[in-house]
C-alpha cells in the first residue's frame, strides 16, 4: 500500500472528512439504520433529514475554528450539498488538532414514537393496576363476608329444620301415649332452655365457623401480579423437573417416588447440586478416558433475580418456605432419601440422590457431595382458636392499613420499573449455569466407570454408541439451527409488534423495520438460489442420461461421447455448486455475528472497502511488476551468455508475459472500477428505494394519526353538542324560566301569605278587643256607681277670682332695622344666610284690681280671666305680622339674590384659581364620582331593593364564550342576565359585563325600591376608549321610558319621555322627565327602539332618580 501523504493527515485538506473522523476517533459515523443509543429526555434530539436547511452562517459556525468541540454536525452532508462525497456527518474538532479527538457517540435520526407511546400508556396502566388492587382488596373482604353470611344463613335454616323435625318427632312420640300431659313448669323450662340455646347458637356460630378449620386471614392474603407470575414460573419449573426425573434412569441411584408434605424446619445434612456439560468437541462423543470436571452451580433464586422489590414476608410465605424440600424458596418435590427419616442413621454413607436445578432448562445430575444445610421433617401442626379469632379481629380492624400498604407497594413497584425503563437501567446478569439441551442424549452409565476396569466389548459398544450419537447430534444441531432461526424470527416479530413491556422493544424505531425488510429480501434471494435446481428433476435428468448412454453389446453408444462428457461436466459442476453452497451455509452458521454486523455497515464503508481493494490492487500491481522484473533480470543474466536464439526466445517469452501481465492488470483494474461503480449505484438505488418506503410509511403514520385525531375531535364535538342540546340547554332553560318568572310566583305566594296574615291579625284584634272589654267592663260599672254616689255630696261655694285687665299695644314694625346684605365675594360659598328678625314682644301695663263681677248666680260662681283673653289676641296679632314680614322679606331676598348672582357671573371670568381652590374642586369631583358618578339616589339599584320583573318578549343573545368548568371539566356556557343592568359590580364598566338581546328592539321592566316622583333617568354605556377598536355599535339609540302602576296594567302606563342616546357624547347621559305621572311610580320600563347597527343590543347601567313619595 502506498504510504499516506501529509495531506491525508490534515483535516482541512482531506477529501472524505467522515473517513478522516472515523479513522481518528475509532468510531464510525452512523447511518440511517443505526439504532437510538441515547437516553430518553436526558439529551436533546439530533438533526435529521427533515430538519430545516442550515444557512451559510450556520455552516461557517459549525465548521469553523470554534473555541469548543461539538458532538455532531450535518454541515458536510449530501442532504444539504449534493456535490460533496457520500458521507453522513463529521464531528467538529473545534479548532483543535486531530490527535485530541476522543472517542464519542454519534446519533442518527431517531423516532420517539415508541418512547412517547410508553409515556402515554404508563399512567393509564398504573391507574388501572391501582384500581384493580384496591378492588381486589375489597373483594377479599366482601368475599369473606358474603360466604360467611351465606354459611350462617344455611346453618340457621338447617338448625330450624332440625328443631322442627325434633319437635314433630317429639309430638308424634308423645301423642302415642294417651292422657299423658307434662306439667306446665316442665314445658316452660324446656321453652326457656331452647330459646337461650338458639340464642347462643346464633351468637357463637360465626366464631365457630371461623375457628372450625383453624385458618386465619392468611388464606385471603393479597398477592401481587409479580407473586403470581413467580408462582406460575416455579410451577412450570417443578413440572419440568418431575418430567425429567420420570423420563431418565440413573444407575445406582434411588428410584423412590417423590412425596409432598408439610415438614418442620430442622437443620440436618443434605447435598449440593453439581452439574456438568456433556457436550464434547470430539467427533466421536465423550470418551471414557477423558475426565469430566464437575462444575458447582450457584444460582440466585427467583426472589433474588427480580428487578423490582418484593413484598415483605408474611406468615403464608414463611410457611411456604418451611414446606420447601429441594430449594428453600420454592415448593417442589424431593425424593424420600432427603427426609430426615431415611437419612437419620445413614448420613455417613453419603448416598448420592438426584436433584435438578431450577433454571431455563433441566441440568444433568452427577455424583453429589454432602454439605451442611437445612432439611425438614414431618410435624403435625396444632392451632389455637383464640389466636385465630384475634387474628380475624385484627385483620378487620387494620384493613385500611393493609389496603394502604398494597397501594403503596404497587406505586413503588411500577414507579421503580418506569424509572428503570426511562433511564435504560440494565440489571446485573444472572450467574452462568451449564444446562443440557432438550435434544441432548442422557449420559450413559459408562461415564462413571473407570477406563481400566472396562472390557474391550464395552469399549467397542461405547465407541459405536458415541459414533452414532455424534451422527444424531449433527442432525440435531442442524434441526436445532432451523428451529432456533424460526424461534428468533418469531421472537423478533413478537418484540416488534407485541412486546410492549420488553426493554429491547422500547427502542423500537422504523430502522428495525427497514432492517427486517432487508433481511426478508436477502432470505428470498437465498431461497431462490438454493431452490433453483430441483432435486427430483436433477435426479431424473441424471438417470435419463445414464439410461441414454447405455449401449447394447456389439453396438455403438446411443449418446455421443462429447454429450456424455458434457453431462458429466454438468453433474460435477452442480456438485461444486452444492459444495460452495454448503460452505456458504456453514460460514453463515459460524459467522452469524460477523454477517449481522455487515448487514448494518454504513454505505460509505463499502466505499472504503472498494478503495481498499483498489489499494490492494495497486500493491499487487507493484509486487507483480517487481517479481516479473526480477525474473526477467535473472533470466537475462542466466541466459546472457546463451545463444542469440535462446536470448531472443527469452525476450519473446518475457514480452509475452509482460503483455499478459499488462492485460491482466488492465482487466482487473477495469473489473474493480466497474464493481465499485455497480456497488455504489446499487447502494444508492437500495437507499433511495428504502428512503421512499420510509417516507411513505412516515406519511401514512402521520395521516393515520391526523385521521384518528380528527375522528376523536369530531367525536368530542358531537358529545359536547349532545350534552349541550339535550342536557345543558333544557336545564338552563328551566333555570332561566325560573329566574325570569320567580317574581310572579313570589307575588302570588306573597299575596296568599298577606291574606293569611290579615285574617290572623283581624282575628287576633277581635280576640284582644273582647278580652279588653271583659276586663274593662267591671271597672266601668264601678266608675258609674261612684259618680252616682257623688251626686249626693254637699254643695260648696266657690269664690270668683277677679280677672286683671291687660293692654297689649301694637308692636312697632318700623323699629325693625333691616341690615344691608353683604356682598358675597367668596365663590365657593354661594349660600345666603338669612338672619331672622326678632318678633315683637307685648309691653305689660299695670292695672288696678277691680272688684269681682258676678256673672251668673247659681250654685257655682263663674269668673272671666282677662289674662287669657289678652294672650289670645296677642297671638293672633303676632301671626298676622309674622306672615306679612316673611312675605316682604322673601321678596327682598329674591331681588338681592338675583343681583348677587349676576354680579358673581361677571366676576367669575376674572377669578384666578389657586392651589387650595383647585384641591377643593378636585375633592368635589371625587366625591361626586364616589357617589355613583351622579351624586343622586338610584332607586333602581338592585342592592337597595330594586328588581328586574320582566323583559317582555326580548330574547337573550348568547355568545357561547364563557365556558364554566368544574375540575377542568366543561359544564355549561355562562351569560349575563338582565339583572346586571341594575347592579353595581364595580365603579367602572368593562366590555362584556352587560345584558344583550337579539336585534335592535327590546324591553326591560324594573321595580323600584320606593314609590317616587320621577325626576330624571340616566343611562351609562362603555366608553370608546375601552371598547375593542372603539366599536360601540351595540349601544342603544332610541329609547322610551314608561311608568306603570302595575307592571301588567298597560292601560295605566304613562310615557315619561322618548330620548336618544348620543354615541358621541359622554358615556353617562341624563334624561329629564318630560311628563310626570299623576301617581307615585313604583314600576319603570325602558323600551329600546333602535341601536347603531349591530345585530344585537347591549345594556350596561340604568339609573332612575327622583324624590320619595309617602303612600
Curated annotation (Swiss-Prot):
Topological domains annotated Perinuclear space: 531-1111
Result for mutant: residue 988 to F: In sa61; defects in nuclear migration and anchoring in hyp7 hypodermal precursor cells. No defects in localization to the nuclear envelope, however unc-83 localization to the nuclear envelope is abolished
Molecular-function GO terms, alphabetical: lamin binding; protein-membrane adaptor activity
Gene: unc-84
Name this polypeptide is given: Nuclear migration and anchoring protein unc-84
Organism: Caenorhabditis elegans
Entry superkingdom: Eukaryota
Keyword Membrane tagged: yes
Chain segments carrying region Disordered: 232-253
Amino acid at each position: 500500500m502506498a504510504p499516506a501523504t501529509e495531506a491525508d493527515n490534515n483535516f482541512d485538506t482531506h477529501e472524505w472528512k467522515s473517513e478522516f473522523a472515523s479513522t481518528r476517533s475509532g468510531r464510525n459515523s452512523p447511518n440511517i439504520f443505526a439504532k437510538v443509543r441515547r437516553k430518553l429526555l436526558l439529551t436533546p434530539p439530533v438533526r435529521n433529514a427533515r430538519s430545516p436547511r442550515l444557512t451559510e452562517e450556520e455552516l461557517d459556525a459549525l465548521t469553523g475554528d470554534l473555541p469548543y468541540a461539538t458532538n455532531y454536525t450535518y454541515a458536510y452532508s449530501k442532504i444539504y450539498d449534493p456535490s460533496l462525497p457520500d458521507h453522513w456527518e463529521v464531528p467538529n474538532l473545534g479548532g483543535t488538532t486531530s490527535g485530541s479527538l476522543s472517542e464519542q457517540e454519534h446519533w442518527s435520526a431517531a423516532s420517539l414514537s415508541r418512547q412517547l407511546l410508553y409515556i402515554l400508556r404508563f399512567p393509564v396502566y398504573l391507574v388501572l393496576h391501582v384500581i384493580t388492587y384496591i378492588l381486589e382488596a375489597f373483594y377479599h373482604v366482601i368475599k369473606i363476608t358474603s360466604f360467611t353470611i351465606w354459611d350462617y344463613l344455611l346453618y340457621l335454616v338447617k338448625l330450624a329444620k332440625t328443631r322442627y323435625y325434633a319437635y314433630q318427632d317429639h309430638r308424634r312420640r308423645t301423642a302415642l301415649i294417651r292422657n299423658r300431659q307434662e306439667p306446665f313448669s316442665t314445658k316452660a323450662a324446656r321453652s326457656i332452655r331452647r330459646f337461650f340455646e338458639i340464642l347462643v347458637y346464633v351468637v357463637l356460630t360465626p366464631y365457630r365457623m371461623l375457628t372450625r378449620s383453624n385458618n386465619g386471614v392468611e388464606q385471603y392474603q393479597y398477592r401481587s401480579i409479580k407473586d403470581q407470575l413467580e408462582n406460575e414460573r416455579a410451577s412450570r419449573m417443578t413440572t419440568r423437573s418431575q418430567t425429567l426425573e420420570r423420563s431418565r434412569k440413573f444407575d445406582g441411584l434411588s428410584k423412590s417416588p417423590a412425596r409432598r408434605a408439610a415438614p418442620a424446619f430442622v437443620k440436618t445434612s443434605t447435598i449440593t447440586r453439581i452439574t456438568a456439560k456433556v457436550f464434547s468437541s470430539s467427533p466421536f462423543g465423550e470418551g471414557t478416558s477423558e475426565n469430566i470436571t464437575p462444575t458447582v452451580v450457584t444460582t440466585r433464586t427467583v426472589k433474588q433475580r427480580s428487578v423490582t422489590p418484593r413484598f415483605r414476608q408474611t406468615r403464608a410465605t414463611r410457611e411456604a418456605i418451611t414446606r420447601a424440600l429441594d430449594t428453600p424458596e420454592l415448593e417442589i418435590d424431593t425424593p424420600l432419601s432427603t427426609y430426615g427419616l431415611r437419612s437419620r442413621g445413614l448420613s455417613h454413607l453419603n448416598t448420592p440422590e438426584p436433584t435438578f436445578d431450577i433454571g431455563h432448562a433441566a441440568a444433568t445430575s452427577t455424583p453429589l457431595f454432602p454439605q451442611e444445610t437445612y432439611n425438614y421433617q414431618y410435624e403435625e401442626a396444632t392451632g389455637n382458636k383464640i389466636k385465630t379469632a384475634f387474628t380475624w379481629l385484627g385483620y378487620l380492624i387494620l384493613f385500611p392499613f393493609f389496603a394502604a400498604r398494597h397501594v403503596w407497594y404497587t406505586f413503588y413497584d411500577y414507579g421503580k420499573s418506569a424509572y428503570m425503563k426511562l433511564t435504560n437501567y440494565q440489571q446485573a446478569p444472572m450467574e452462568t449455569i451449564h444446562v443440557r439441551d432438550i435434544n441432548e442424549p442422557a449420559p450413559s452409565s459408562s461415564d462413571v466407570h473407570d477406563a481400566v476396569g472396562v472390557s474391550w466389548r464395552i469399549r467397542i459398544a461405547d465407541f459405536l454408541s458415541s459414533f452414532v450419537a455424534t451422527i444424531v447430534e449433527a442432525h440435531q444441531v442442524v434441526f436445532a439451527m432451523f428451529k432456533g432461526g424460526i424461534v428468533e424470527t418469531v421472537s423478533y416479530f413478537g418484540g416488534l409488534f407485541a412486546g410492549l413491556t420488553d426493554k429491547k422493544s422500547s427502542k423500537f424505531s422504523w430502522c428495525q423495520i427497514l432492517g427486517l425488510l432487508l433481511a426478508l429480501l436477502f432470505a428470498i434471494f437465498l431461497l431462490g438460489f438454493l431452490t433453483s435446481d430441483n432435486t427430483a428433476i436433477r435426479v431424473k435428468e441424471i438417470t435419463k442420461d445414464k439410461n441414454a448412454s447405455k449401449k447394447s453389446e456389439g453396438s455403438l453408444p446411443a449418446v455421443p461421447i462429447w454429450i456424455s462428457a458434457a453431462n458429466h461436466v454438468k453433474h460435477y459442476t452442480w456438485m461444486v455448486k452444492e459444495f460452495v453452497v454448503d460452505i456458504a451455509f456453514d460460514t453463515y452458521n459460524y459467522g452469524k455475528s460477523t454477517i449481522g454486523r455487515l448487514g448494518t455497515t454504513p454505505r460509505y464503508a463499502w466505499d472504503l472497502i472498494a478503495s481498499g481493494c483498489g489499494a490492494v490492487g495497486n500493491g499487487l500491481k507493484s509486487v507483480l511488476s517487481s517479481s516479473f522484473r526480477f525474473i526477467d533480470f535473472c533470466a537475462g543474466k542466466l541466459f546472457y551468455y546463451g545463444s542469440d536464439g535462446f536470448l531472443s526466445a527469452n525476450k519473446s517469452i518475457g514480452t509475452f508475459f509482460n503483455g499478459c501481465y499488462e492485460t491482466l492488470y488492465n482487466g482487473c483494474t477495469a473489473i474493480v472500477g466497474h464493481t465499485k461503480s455497480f456497488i455504489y449505484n446499487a447502494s444508492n438505488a437500495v437507499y433511495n428505494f428504502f428512503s421512499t418506503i420510509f417516507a411513505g410509511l412516515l406519511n401514512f403514520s402521520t395521516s393515520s394519526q391526523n385521521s384518528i385525531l380528527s375522528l376523536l375531535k369530531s367525536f368530542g364535538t358531537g358529545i359536547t353538542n349532545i350534552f349541550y342540546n339535550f342536557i345543558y340547554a333544557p336545564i338552563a332553560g328551566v333555570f332561566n324560566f325560573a329566574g325570569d318568572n320567580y317574581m310572579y310566583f313570589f307575588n302570588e305566594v306573597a299575596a296568599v301569605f298577606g291574606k293569611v296574615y290579615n285574617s290572623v291579625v283581624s282575628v287576633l284584634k277581635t280576640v284582644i278587643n273582647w278580652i279588653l272589654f271583659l276586663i274593662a267592663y267591671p271597672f266601668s260599672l264601678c266608675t258609674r256607681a261612684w259618680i252616682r254616689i257623688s251626686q249626693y255630696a254637699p254643695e260648696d261655694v266657690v269664690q270668683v277670682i277677679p280677672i286683671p285687665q291687660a293692654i297689649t299695644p301694637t308692636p312697632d314694625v318700623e323699629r325693625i332695622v333691616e341690615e344691608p346684605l353683604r356682598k358675597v365675594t367668596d365663590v365657593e360659598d354661594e349660600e345666603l344666610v338669612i338672619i331672622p328678625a326678632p318678633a315683637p314682644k307685648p309691653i305689660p301695663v299695670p292695672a288696678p284690681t277691680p272688684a269681682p263681677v258676678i256673672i251668673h248666680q247659681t250654685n257655682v260662681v263663674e269668673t272671666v280671666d282677662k289674662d287669657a283673653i289678652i294672650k289670645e289676641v296677642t297671638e293672633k296679632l303676632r301671626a298676622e305680622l309674622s306672615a306679612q314680614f316673611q312675605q316682604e322679606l322673601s321678596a327682598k331676598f329674591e331681588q338681592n339674590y338675583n343681583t348677587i348672582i349676576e354680579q358673581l357671573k361677571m366676576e367669575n371670568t376674572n377669578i384666578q384659581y389657586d392651589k387650595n381652590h383647585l384641591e377643593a374642586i378636585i375633592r368635589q369631583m371625587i366625591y361626586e364620582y364616589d357617589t355613583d358618578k351622579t351624586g343622586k339616589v338610584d332607586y333602581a339599584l338592585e342592592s337597595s331593593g330594586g328588581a328586574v320583573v320582566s323583559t317582555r318578549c326580548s330574547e337573550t343573545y348568547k355568545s357561547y364564550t364563557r365556558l364554566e368548568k368544574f375540575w377542568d371539566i366543561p359544564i355549561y356556557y355562562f351569560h349575563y342576565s338582565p339583572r346586571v343592568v341594575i347592579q353595581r359590580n364595580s365603579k367602572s364598566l368593562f366590555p362584556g359585563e352587560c345584558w344583550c338581546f337579539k336585534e335592535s328592539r327590546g324591553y326591560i321592566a324594573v321595580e323600584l325600591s320606593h314609590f317616587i316622583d320621577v325626576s330624571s333617568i340616566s343611562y351609562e354605556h362603555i366608553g370608546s376608549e375601552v371598547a375593542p377598536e372603539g366599536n360601540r355599535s351595540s349601544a342603544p339609540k332610541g329609547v322610551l321610558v314608561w311608568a306603570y302602576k302595575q307592571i301588567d296594567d298597560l292601560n295605566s302606563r304613562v310615557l315619561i319621555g322618548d330620548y336618544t342616546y348620543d354615541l358621541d357624547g359622554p358615556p353617562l347621559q341624563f334624561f329629564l322627565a318630560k311628563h310626570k305621572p299623576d301617581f307615585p311610580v313604583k314600576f319603570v320600563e325602558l323600551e329600546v327602539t333602535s341601536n347603531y347597527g349591530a345585530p344585537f343590543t347591549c345594556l350596561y347601567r340604568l339609573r332612575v332618580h327622583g324624590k320619595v313619595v309617602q303612600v
